[in-house]
Amino acid sequence: AFGTILKALAKIAGKVVKKLATKPGATYMLKENLQ
């Protein structure tokens, strides 16, 4: 069950990253989130 949750989160994260990557300032946003 835990593995399924991780897979779901990975899919969601991938979608978010793709959306951010198409917008200006995406790199800045990612850096801020990682800190």
From Swiss-Prot:
Disulfide bonds: none annotated. Signal peptide: none annotated. This is Cupiennin-2c. It comes from Cupiennius salei (American wandering spider). Expressed by the venom gland. Keywords: Amidation, Secreted, Toxin. GO terms for molecular function: toxin activity. Its main location: secreted. It comes from the Eukaryota. The modification Glutamine amide is found at Q35. It is found in: Secreted.
